[in-house]
Amino acid sequence: MSGSVWDIEGLLCEDDIPYEQEVAKNPNNLSNWLRYYRFKSSTSSCTFQNRVFILERAVKQLPRSYKLWMIYIDVVLQEVQTSVSYKSKSEILSVNMVFERSLQLLNRAPILWIKYLEFLVETQPYEITLLRRKFNECLYNLPISQHHLIWPLYIRFADDVGGMTGVKVYLKYLQYANPESLQGLNNEQEGELGITIDDIISKLVEFGDVKEASKLFQHILQHTDKFIGLSKSPLQLWIEYIDLLVNSVSKNKRSTVNYNEFDYFFEKLIKDGLQKFPDQIGKFYLKLTFYFIKRKNLFKARYYFDEGLKTCVSVKDFTMIFDSYTEFEENILTNMSEKLEKLGEDSDLNNELDLRMNVFEKLINDRPYLLNDMMLRQDVNNLDEWFKKIVLYKKDSDINMMLDTYAAALRTINPLKAHSLANKKENTLPNLWINYANVYASQNDVKTANLIFSKSVKSQFQSPDDLATLYIEWCELFVKHNDDKKAIEIVEDICTSERGKFDYNDSSIDIHIRVQKSIKLWSFYLDLLESMIENNNQIDEIEKVINAYNITIDLKIATPLTIINFANFLEEWNFYERSFSAYEMGLKIFKDSKIKFEIWNIYLSKIIKHELNIERIRDLFEQCLNESSIEGYNGCPANLCKPVYLLYSQYEQSKGWFTKSVKILQQGLSKLDDGYNQEFYTKAEKDTILRDKFDIYQVLISKILKLNDHNETRKIYEQSLKDNQLTLPNLIQLTMEFINFETELMEFNRVRSLFKYVCQLSNPQSPLIEPIWHNWETFELNHGNEATFKDMLRFKRKIVTEFEKDIILKNSLNPMGFVKSSQGPKVSSIAISAPKEENNPDSIDLDMDM
């Protein structure tokens, strides 16, 4: 570009003359040249030639100006990059020349070098020699402290070029890089590329230099303690080295290679690897098989496949070996079949093919058994695998092997370490015993099944619940064979024996003692006793059941379900008062309010069903809802009491006490109101209270509506609208119901007052309020006139304006937009500040703008 012939008339205009005069007067002033360039660049008519005309003269005058050269180079690069026309070689070389000129005096400017090298890589990737020479020249001129700026580009160039050039670049980087960086210990330090020695090895292999890669592998494997920071573990590096050797052997066709020595070296390498990584048996055996397949030594390949399957200890290794083994055999069979087709009938080859086919089929069929054996070698206490093994033999209908497997499992498993990795409920040690006994029971061999159960309950287990399961199944064995007496003897022997006082959860006590307090076993015992009763005349049997229930209560193992079952049993045999006493006993035993609520719920329903004295029932309802004589009971919690109040109210109504029914619902609202203000309720419980409160309002309103007492109905609606605890959606729903009620009565002034009230509750544009405005408009169209419609529109404009002012005020007071928490909806300040309208004799008595 320096050799261009300039057309002065085409490059200069009258506006340029002052700037030309300045640079002519003081050509060595950088500011003059920069002002001139910036002015010219800002004009719409400025072309690439205009810029170059100024910059070329500037850099000639100030050849050491880094700033001018950078501007010049950026202009040239931009022109080359944005030009849509074909770029000739001469144009590219002219850009090269600009860079070369700049670097003659600024050869220590890394940014110039980077721009130059990036340009060369992008536009002249085929000039390998030029690129390599310029990279080396750059590294030679720049101080070593700045080399880290160049190496990323140099490495990218090496990756693109590959081959021996790429190898030389990476080996050169190997000399430059910090040893700690190569070891993966200090890759975050400034100037490090994050390239480790294993990355370099990968590149050397990719570029075809196996010899250099092998040297680096050996160096790493001999000093694994120094390379702990690498992204690849020593195991990964070891396997990569093995793969490298396998691939190099398969490519080596020279007859001078001593394969026997190489085989010995390779097998020794694998054995050394097994010593270092004993948990990688499968993977290393697989490498051996691949090696001998490459060597076409199929006998040794099969030998190591079999050895691998016998010694591997992980599913991953087993799957890899087995899949590779089957693929290997399939390929052999395919090759033999193709060979047989070409040769025609060949008895020897045919026999060999049949033999190999049988071996292959056996290998496929044995897979689940081989895998199961491997899993049991890995963990003999894994119940899942023992159950799988039994299922395998069951599918084959091999009863003898099933029984042998049961016996082997129960003989081998440590009961205190038995577990199910899959967390399957059915895969338990008790079920192993039970299934074992059931094999004989299914063949009507009750004697052997009984013997197995008798041995099972003497074994150790991890929890008393396991032992209880065995006792239950043992009893079921005799129940199924119509020997209920023997079943009861077995369970009574354990449940009624004297054991003294102990804690069921005390792990220091033998489970054979703790099982006496197993509610699971007691529940079965109770069910068994109850099943023996057929009529009311069996007094002794009934008393025996009652006594058993009382023992569970005395042992303090009764659950809420036990109490309910006890009460149901007594009710079933017409012991009603004793049934009610059972419920009351449960209320005394259990302290949890939710449990008490459930018991009360059932108790009250039952006592209403039997139509006892009304005062007694009322007294029970009052005890349930409020503090009672029951120790530690302070009344039903507010978040649970709604069903009780509804049941109580419905009961009173069914007895003709309508006023009391309504009063009870009002009491419920009061209790919920007080409960919502208590701090000990959680947010979720308070949300429940609000929902229950709204539901009670709905029930209360529906009751009053049936009376056709308009004044009482209005009072309830007004009460609900004054309730500041209800949510906005609830208030809106109640208001709209109130509006419909007044509309049916043609109390239009009241309706308008209600519309005004509800429309003030939130922003007129909110999704909740906007439909209400539409309803109001519809109402005025149907029942109003032009004046009332205009009044509605004026009110709407006022509300919109007030809300806009309210928002502006809030934003000015709280510019960060923090929101203060609140409880329930609050009526807008509009309702407070709005002027009162004239008194309306038909208006509703609410705290709202009417």
Swiss-Prot record:
Keyword Repeat set for record: yes
Cellular component GO terms held in the UniProt record: post-mRNA release spliceosomal complex; Prp19 complex; U2-type catalytic step 2 spliceosome
Protein keywords: mRNA processing, mRNA splicing, Nucleus, Repeat, Spliceosome
Compartment list: Nucleus
Gene3D superfamilies to which the protein is assigned, alphabetical: Tetratricopeptide repeat domain
GO BP of this protein: generation of catalytic spliceosome for first transesterification step
Disulfide bond residue pairs: none
Superkingdom field: Eukaryota
HAT repeat boundaries on the chain: 10-42, 46-78, 90-122, 126-160, 208-247, 408-442, 444-480, 500-531, 574-609, 612-653, 708-744, 746-782
UniProt keyword annotation of Acetylation present: no
SMART domains according to UniProt: HAT
Function: Involved in pre-mRNA splicing and cell cycle progression.
Subunit structure: Associated with the spliceosome.
Family: Belongs to the crooked-neck family.
UniProt-recorded name of the protein: Pre-mRNA-splicing factor SYF1
Organism of origin: Debaryomyces hansenii (strain ATCC 36239 / CBS 767 / BCRC 21394 / JCM 1990 / NBRC 0083 / IGC 2968) (Yeast)
High-level lineage: Eukaryota, Fungi, Dikarya, Ascomycota, Saccharomycotina
Encoding gene per record: SYF1
